[in-house]
C-alpha cells in the first residue's frame, strides 16, 4: 500500500536531528535567531502536525512562530527581609509550560484572533520555538466552516488564557484520568477551596 505524503513528513519529524531534516533545521534556526520573538509565517513548518491540529490553508487561518526562553523563572532577589526558607530565587520554576506561554504571547499580539492549538518546531540551548494556529472568528470563511466555526462562539474568547488549549489542559493535569487525579477537577484551586 502506498504511503501518504504526510506519513513521510511525520517520520522525518520523529527524529529532526537526523537525516535531511537536520541540515534544514540547522539553517532554519540560524534565521529564526535573527527574527523577532513573534513572527507570522506563510505556511506551517510541520504541515502534518498542523493539519492534525485543525489547520486549513484558507483565509482567516494564521500561523505564528513564537520563541520562548528556556530555563527557570529568573526571579529577582527580594529586597525586604525573609527567613531563609522563603528566600528562594534560583530554583523557582514556572507553573505553566513553555508551549502555553508561547500561545499566550501570540494571542496577546494578535488580539482579534483566537488560538486553536500549537506545536513544537525546534529548540536550541537557550530557547524553544512553537508555531501557533490562530483563527479569525469574524471571518466568513471561518464562520461557514463546519469544522472550525465552534471557535466563533463568545464562550471561546480568551480561551488560551483560561487553559482551554491542549497545552493549557496538559499544564492543568486534565489529560490524566483515573486514580490520583481526584484533586484536578474542576481545577486544583477549586479542589483546595472545597477541602478547606
From Swiss-Prot:
List the residue ranges forming a coiled coil, or say none: none
**GO terms under cellular component:** cytosolic large ribosomal subunit
Chain spans, region Disordered: 162-196
Q: Where is the composition biased (Basic residues)?
A: 162-172
Q: Which GO terms describe its biological process?
A: cytoplasmic translation
Alphabetically ordered keywords of this record: Ribonucleoprotein, Ribosomal protein
Query: What start and end residues bound the annotated signal peptide?
Result: none
Gene Ontology molecular functions = RNA binding; structural constituent of ribosome
* Name the UniProt record assigns to this protein: Large ribosomal subunit protein eL15
Q: Which species?
A: Halobacterium salinarum (strain ATCC 700922 / JCM 11081 / NRC-1) (Halobacterium halobium)
Name of the gene: rpl15e
